[in-house]
Amino acid sequence: AGDAVLVSLAKLLRYSLRDIDLPARLGGEEFAVLLPGEGAEGAIILAERLRSAVEQDAVAFGGKHLNYTSSFGVISLPAQGTAGKLDAQVAKNVALLKSRENTDVADILYSLVDAALYQAKETGRNRCMPVDLANLADQIST
């Protein structure tokens, strides 16, 4: 059944994303989609649209139709050329995380969005959970 779901999901992504968007399977049942030039609001709208489409999808397997759901963590950075306009608190929070985790910004963003994904799963599944870079106090204090 898992392979049938992956095939169906790949088709759904192909028809739902722009040509410049980049979906990637991270492993198992985890995927990432890079949305160049898309802001936080657009990313959340797309994640919700994908979540709804997955919820309505059914996969034929073993003579039955199987439904499945999805959960999303969503994170966004400013578009290229506007990074200098990052709110001072966001920049401070990201710098603090970088110094604590001794890693680069991409790894920090992945850690934050992965935590949001698991929060979405823990709070009922089949939902989208955005990361608010301006309010990282919870992630920094732990």
Residue ranges and their predicted role:
Residues 27, 63, 70-78, 130-135:
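A general secondary-structure junction signal
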Residues 40, 44, 77-142:
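Catalytic-core segments of nucleotide cyclases and related cyclic-nucleotide turnover enzymes
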Residues 1, 62-64:
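Glycine-rich helix-loop "coupling/hinge" segments at transmembrane-helix boundaries
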Residues 22-25, 66:
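A short pre-motif secondary-structure segment
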Residues 15, 19, 37, 52, ...:
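Conserved amphipathic alpha-helical interaction elements at protein-protein interfaces in regulatory
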Residues 5, 32-52, 65, 70, ...:
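Short helix/loop segment flanking the catalytic signature motif in cyclic-nucleotide metabolism enzymes
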Residues 12, 18, 25, 49-51, ...:
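Short, cationic motifs built from Arg/Lys/His that form the positively charged side of catalytic pockets
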Residues 1-15, 24-28, 32-33, 40-48, ...:
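Conserved long alpha-helical elements within nucleotide-processing catalytic cores of c-di-GMP signaling
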